[in-house]
Amino acid sequence: MKFFWVSSLLGLLGLSTAIPLSTEADALLDRKTIYFGMKAYDDVNCKGSTSYTISFNKCQAYPNINSINALTDGAVCTVYVYSSNNCTGEPVFQTDSDGIECINVDAFETGSWKFKC
């Protein structure tokens, strides 16, 4: 009987420690959704061929991007567009996104962008 009580208690402790881990795993899955939900397009209406999949918090150069289709899944993320190829200097464009929307960045011929969440 004593063994059963101790093993049951350990089982409950294991369950209670697994819940925060599960929540953390869900947050990571949400980040993956955010990551794969960001696409850059040549068309200003976020239609046609996709130019890039956006990696957030990473500077990426582009030849010509007119718009971004952003799925941020509740998080507030900001698009920063730079006229330089390495995300230096002041952004020439920035806007926040907190849902599924087409963001017209009207980018220059060359430059770079960051998507920070």
From Swiss-Prot:
Record's signal peptide:
1-18
UniProtKB keywords: Glycoprotein, Signal
Q: Which GO CC terms are listed, alphabetically?
A: cytoplasm; cytosol
Q: Which residues are glycosylated?
A: 86
- Name of the protein in question: Uncharacterized protein C922.04
